[in-house]
Amino acid sequence: MDNIRDEIIQNVKEKFEADSNVIGLVLAGSSFNNSGINKNSDIDFVVVTISPGGQFEFYHDKGIWVEIFYEDEERIKKCFEDNDEIMINCFKDGRILIDNKGLLGELKKSAMDIVEDYEISDYNLKRLKYRLQVILLKIKNAYLKKDLDKLIFLCMYVFPHLIRGLYIINHKIPPTLGLWYDRDRILKLEGGDLLVNLFEAIKNSSSKQDIDEIYNIFMQLNNLLDSKTGGAFKGWKDKRKEHFQTFL
């Protein structure tokens, strides 16, 4: 993977050092091939920033770089037509372009801002629900065994997904650039107080007497996310909302 990454970084340099004003656009997937993205790969949200002088930074949850484009509205739209499960983010000087399922739109936000009225794709929602369901069984098992260390480990392991879930049910795009736990922003979300309470309970836990508090807060969070993702999304202005029925 390191060799592939080095190859792609070199490709970035060659394309952007010639014109530092070009906006970078990156697609990422779990497999690398010359033709671009693999539709069946596990795709996460990825950005590449290009600053004056050709400096660049990469941010990603998983996957490796597969193809880089210049800013080209028609080509971007074509990407979404051909690859149904890709979200693309490209930005420069506080301008951010976010597109999902081919609905191209310009949002006057900085890269760190939370975007209002975000319509999450059924693909990403399905992944979130799956991850929470899998970890829930392990958390229940740790609680029944009164294994505080394992319960804390599992809660922190799933913590980013809890945060992502809260942003989703509040119709906001989840933060992607290291802002997973921003206490002030999270407290503004429905259910944000529960997440903060969970974090504090974990941080201050010292004995097995704390296991009930941690577990109860987690279950309140889980129940909130489960109830919201089981019904709230039906009212969204999503032309493809019928696809939600496959997993709600």
State the predicted function of each range.
Residues 118-248:
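Conserved nucleotidyltransferase catalytic core and NTase-mimicking acidic/glycine-rich helix/loop elements
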Residues 38-40, 80-81, 178-180:
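Short aromatic-enriched loop/helix-cap "lid" or pocket-rim segments at secondary-structure transitions
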Residues 6-12, 33-34, 97-105, 144, ...:
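Short N-terminal helix-initiation segments at or just after the protein's N-terminus
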Residues 1-24:
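Helical scaffold of the NTase/Pol beta-like nucleotidyltransferase catalytic core
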